């Protein structure tokens, strides 16, 4: 019954619209609402504009952190997108992270990401990056430190529990050792994997390849074999529309090793 009532009202609206336009010399057209995009969407900037007020506030807070922890803070900078970066000594991981988490003017209680960057040309090739978030002040900060292949860095699990699996991933991918980690083992690669794939000196082909051996009924690891003595690229394909125009028959015979017949 409700559907029938709605249909009757809709039909009455059509008849009413046609009656209004009758006798005016114009065709009876039912105008339907059209959804239009706002004009402001086209003029909206695609890049975040520079906020000078926020830039000054972040610079002042960075200087404040450097004054309180001068032993560990080595450099403070604000990026063009108003992101504060603090570069610290490797010995200051725990003190700096604890300060940023507990201080009244910081309250960076969330570790949103922890990663590493490999720059082989540097003496300390690995850069460890901590990205922190303060919900209290709606602000972010990036803490950077450095290490090499042999020097361990203090684990941040005692400050942020979320650093547990992040540090395992860095150990697995880059080979950076975190001291005092509760369970530092590989997390992405397979058991017995050799090397660390995210290092710049790691070969693209890897060191071993895995395959299923039907004789032993299990997956086995073997050295990578990519060498080929001879590779012949046959450009003719039966799936092409005009395969005969790809290469003349004479060149095919010459490629196969036949001698060119003497011209008579």
UniProtKB/Swiss-Prot annotation:
Keywords (A to Z) from UniProt: Disease variant, Electron transport, Membrane, Mitochondrion, Mitochondrion inner membrane, NAD, Oxidoreductase, Primary mitochondrial disease, Respiratory chain, Transit peptide, Translocase, Transport, Ubiquinone
EC numbers: 7.1.1.2
Presence of the UniProt keyword Transmembrane helix in the record: no
Record field: catalytic activity: a ubiquinone + NADH + 5 H(+)(in) = a ubiquinol + NAD(+) + 4 H(+)(out)
GO biological process: aerobic respiration; mitochondrial electron transport, NADH to ubiquinone; mitochondrial respiratory chain complex I assembly; proton motive force-driven mitochondrial ATP synthesis; reactive oxygen species metabolic process; substantia nigra development
Subcellular location, record wording: Mitochondrion inner membrane
Function: Core subunit of the mitochondrial membrane respiratory chain NADH dehydrogenase (Complex I) which catalyzes electron transfer from NADH through the respiratory chain, using ubiquinone as an electron acceptor. Essential for the catalytic activity and assembly of complex I.
Clinical note on disease: Mitochondrial complex I deficiency, nuclear type 8: A form of mitochondrial complex I deficiency, the most common biochemical signature of mitochondrial disorders, a group of highly heterogeneous conditions characterized by defective oxidative phosphorylation, which collectively affects 1 in 5-10000 live births. Clinical disorders have variable severity, ranging from lethal neonatal disease to adult-onset neurodegenerative disorders.
Record's protein name: NADH dehydrogenase [ubiquinone] iron-sulfur protein 3, mitochondrial
